[in-house]
Curated annotation (Swiss-Prot):
One of its GO terms (biological process) is negative regulation of DNA-templated transcription. This is Alanine--tRNA ligase. It catalyses: tRNA(Ala) + L-alanine + ATP = L-alanyl-tRNA(Ala) + AMP + diphosphate. Consists of three domains; the N-terminal catalytic domain, the editing domain and the C-terminal C-Ala domain. The editing domain removes incorrectly charged amino acids, while the C-Ala domain, along with tRNA(Ala), serves as a bridge to cooperatively bring together the editing and aminoacylation centers thus stimulating deacylation of misacylated tRNAs. It comes from Agrobacterium fabrum (strain C58 / ATCC 33970) (Agrobacterium tumefaciens (strain C58)).
Length: 887
């Protein structure tokens, strides 16, 4: 059998020719599932299909699903790199049946694929079944011809599969491969089952139940099949390897790491190359799916993975950012199967490089602290939790990175102490995320969707329409009517109201019936296509099955349209000015303004913002038509339409195009082309004007633009004009002369500040004459000793004053202490050249620092500086130094 890519294709081709729909991998960030941090199994994207909440146009499917396990229940991070089969990122091959076929067909497909297509020796195979699953036991005997001793009944949860605390579940049957008696280990269920002789290669889950709570389990509407086969594991077997990292894909990544570092993947360095290869995969795919490193949630898990890889790069002697340089090797291996890697290459590379550059600034200092803290520890000892927390809080070391750094020395970490330290400092728990737990309140919308189907949206063509009330929901339950003053949610068969999504706020307006009026305060999309109108009955009452007139607030909708279209123009302008790595990370389209988050590693300059604004407004002034078309996702992408990573699109998508490019590669071509379900202006001129208010950081690698359009932009400019006029009046100049007048005032202020600082320094040292400070000079052990405590002097000026004092003394020792407004002290000691053989400025300043409540200090024998928290001890510090000189 050939390489990993061919093995993946063989699996998918087998099920395609057996009538299965080949479904692309879903993103690593689960859609509409708050219970999961990352997609960790092939069935995740089909969860609502299994539970009956969603229907698909096919009843059988197969996929190669990208998965990440690095947090929560499924956490493989600690073992990655040190074992043969642990990964943070892996591909799960699976076939699925949604009420179509069940156990017999699933077992038949599995047996035919592994013995015929893959050509695995059937005599090396054995299986497990759940201990009460007689049906599966007998089917294996019938289909595979197994004897009873090769079908092992397992009574534990190992053979009862569940995705999590809630969700689909059922008994399973696992297929094992026997590597032979030359490898230690026993069959599943035996005391030696943890050995490496018998390796699971495929898990067949017979999906029969849904776990609602810990105590409640119900039958699924239709018995179904969910199977999972790790691509890395089956590839190792088919390539004659016992270790996943010896397969062709990992060998290529490790070879790239070896070439970049010049360190062979042998001995103590073997694990480091493996960690880097694995973590490169998970990091790149997470970034491609829209996750960026941050201090919480998914972003913090990504940061942990990246920093663990960077720590191992440091172990290999790499002193410059390394991981991003390995990205081309990954894309060469996996880019054809996963084109999102190619599309996001610039963003992935820039994010990896930036994060590694930032972390390296603290990595060496953190490792130095760790080395000092463990210098007296031995094998079996524990690092205290306080130090582990300091590494986490000050140096950005995730706890597992500290554990990994101590692993080779077999030193543990006091986890309890770490947790206590975190709680004492009220630090946020960053590595776990439990989701919102709002399933119960959402169930009603899925039930209504199942009952009535999706709401027909009319809002692209009209702002007013007739409809029939299908449901009224109050406090999570259906009711027959709503009376005046009641706050409820209303579902209508068709609506012109846009439901909040894609960053655009939902419409407001009124719903009017024969005997009542409902003020719509917001509209949301629920349950995969249900439009829910929220608000209050302001007059009379409304009831289910009543015919009503729905009218959208026209002025508000117009402003929303303008702001939404502006985000498209800004998005394209940002990509032209900053680079194609720019991708939308979020947005808020409100009536008053717009907010637009994009991936970019550094602040934008004022010049860049002006160019972006000007380019977007060029398209506004074109007043070109905004064109919308319906087409397949593949056709849209082929035409160059931008899609948002992680966004869920149906078989048919809406493509919005606006403007004609005027510059570079975009010249005479459609300017902005995006997949978008929002509402837009009919022509770009209706936007009126785009004015960027500013940009800021919202997280690592994410910048936020805020802007206004149309009337909002005019109001903003009018307000700014009034401010300039008021400022001009205060300065007694014309508005056009305000800038030059302010610059003159600032120059004058700087001059006065310099003169004041010089005067303070002269006054502090006694007036500035050649004998300045003579009254402060005392004779100690026959040496001139000038010591002063100064107020109103910046610490940064102390060295200059000390140099002047040395020059005036000719021969002697100088100690100057500046006390700041907050009571802290800074000290500088200076020794003239003729005395450096007797006295060291470093020793002198450390003596002063100790008296000031500090410790340490450093510099040269002739000039050194230190500090201390207690400036009230300045006199004691001078006395301590005098005593030290006399000793």
């Amino acid at each position: 059998m050939s390489g990993v890519n061919e093995i993946r294709s063989t699996f998918l081709d087998y099920f395609k020719k057996n009538g299965h729909e080949i479904v692309p991998s879903s993103p690593l960030v689960p859609r509409n599932d708050p219970t999961l941090m990352f997609t960790n199994a092939g069935m995740v994207q089909f969860k609502n299909v299994f539970t009956g909440l969603e229907s698909r146009p096919y009843s059988t499917a197969a996929s190669a699903q990208k998965c990440v396990r690095a947090g929560g229940k499924h956490n493989d991070l600690d073992n990655v790199g040190y074992t043969a089969r642990h990964h943070t990122f892996f591909e799960m091959l699976g076939n699925f049946s949604f009420g179509d076929y069940f156990k017999e067909e699933a077992i038949t497909h599995a047996w035919n694929l592994i013995t015929k297509e893959f050509g695995i020796d059937r005599n090396r195979l054995l299986v497990t079944v759940y201990h009460t699953d007689d049906e599966a036991f007998n089917l294996w005997k019938k289909i595979a011809g197994f004897s009873d001793d090769r079908i092992i009944r397992i009574p534990t949860s190992d053979n009862f599969w569940a995705m999590g605390d809630t969700g689909p579940c059922g008994p399973c049957s696992e297929i094992f491969y026997d590597h032979g008696d030359h490898i230690w280990g026993g069959p599943p269920g035996s005391p030696e089952e943890d050995g490496d002789r018998f390796i699971e290669i495929w898990n067949l889950v017979f999906m029969q139940y849904e776990q609602l709570t810990k105590e409640e389990r119900i039958d699924l509407p239709r018995p179904s099949i969910d199977t999972g086969m790790g691509l890395e594991r089956i590839s190792a077997l088919l390539q004659g390897k016992h270790d996943n990292y010896d397969t062709d894909l990992f060998r290529a990544l490790i070879a790239a790491s070896v070439e970049a570092t010049g360190v062979p993947a042998e001995g103590e360095h073997r694990a480091s190359h493996r960690v880097i290869a694995d973590h490169l995969r998970s990091s790149a795919f997470l970034i491609a799916d829209g996750v960026l490193p941050s201090s919480e949630g998914r972003g913090y898990v990504l940061r942990r993975i990246m920093r663990r890889a960077m720590r191992h790069a440091e172990l290999l002697g790499s002193r410059d950012p390394l991981i991003y340089r390995l990205l081309p090797a990954l894309i060469q291996q996996m880019g054809r199967a996963y084109p999102e890697l190619v599309r996001a290459e610039a963003l992935i590379s820039e994010t990896l490089k930036l994060e590694e550059t930032r972390f390296r600034k603290t990595l060496e200092r953190g490792l130095s602290l760790l080395s000092d803290a463990t210098s007296t520890l031995h094998k079996g000892d524990m690092l205290d939790g306080e130090t582990a927390f300091k590494l986490y809080d000050t140096y950005g070391f995730p706890l597992d990175l500290t554990q990994d750094a101590l692993r080779a020395r077999e030193i543990g970490v006091d986890i309890s102490g770490f947790t206590d330290a975190m709680q004492r400092q009220k630090a946020e728990a960053r590595s776990h995320w439990a989701g919102s737990g709002d399933k119960a309140t959402e169930t009603v919308w899925f039930e209504l969707k199942e009952k009535f189907g999706a709401t027909e949206f009319l809002g692209y063509d009209t702002e007013s329409a007739e409809g029939v009330i299908q449901a009224i929901v109050r406090d999570g339950k259906e009711v027959d009517s709503a009376a005046e003053g009641e706050t409820v949610h209303i579902v209508v068969n068709q609506t012109p109201f846009y439901g909040e999504s894609g960053g655009q706020m939902g419409d407001t307006g009124v719903i009017v019936g024969d005997a009542g009026t409902f003020d719509v305060s917001g509209t949301q999309k629920k349950g995969e296509g249900l439009f829910v109108h929220s608000g209050t009955v302001s007059k009379g009452g409304l009831k289910v099955n009543e015919a009503v007139q729905l009218t959208v607030d026209h002025d508000r909708r117009s402003r929303l349209r303008a702001n939404h279209s502006a985000t498209h123009l800004l998005h394209e302008a940002l990509r032209e000015v900053l680079g194609t790595h720019v991708a939308q990370k979020g947005s808020l389209v409100a009536p008053e303004r717009l907010r637009f988050d994009v991936s970019h590693p550094k602040p934008m300059s004022a010049e860049e913002l002006k160019v972006v604004e000007d380019m977007a407004n060029e398209i506004v002034l074109q007043n070109s038509p905004v064109v919308t078309r319906l087409m397949s996702v593949d056709d849209a992408i082929a035409e160059g339409a931008m899609a948002l990573f992680g966004e869920k699109y149906g078989d048919e998508v809406r493509v919005v195009s606006m403007g004609t490019g005027l510059h570079g590669a975009k010249a005479n071509r459609p300017y902005s082309v995006e997949l978008c379900g929002g509402t837009h202006v009919a022509a770009t001129g209706q936007i009126g004007l785009i004015r960027i208010l500013g940009e800021s950081a919202v997280g690592s690698g994410v910048r936020r633009l805020e802007a206004v359009t149309g009337q909002g932009a005019l109001a903003y400019l009018a307000e700014q004009d009034e401010r300039v006029k008021a400022l001009a009046s205060s300065l007694k100049v014309q508005p056009g002369d305000v800038l030059s007048r302010v610059e003159g005032l600032l120059d004058e202020r700087k001059k006065l500040e310099r003169e004041l600082a010089d005067a303070r320094k002269k006054l502090a040292m006694g007036g500035g004459s050649s004998d300045a400070g003579a009254n402060d000079v005392q004779q100690v052990a026959g040496v001139n000793f000038l010591a002063k405590s100064l107020s109103g002097i910046d610490a940064k000026d102390l060295k200059g004053l000390a140099d002047e004092a040395k020059a005036n003394l000719g021969s002697g020792v100088v100690l100057l202490i500046a006390v700041s407004d907050d009571g802290k002290a800074s000290a500088v000691a200076a020794v003239t050249e003729d005395l450096t053989g007797r006295f060291s400025a470093v020793d002198i300043v450390r003596t002063a620092s100790a008296a000031l409540g500090g410790k340490g200090g450093g510099g040269r024998p002739d000039m050194a500086q230190a500090g201390g928290p207690d400036g009230t001890k300045a006199k004691e510090a001078i006395e301590a130094v005098a005593a030290a000189l006399a000793a």
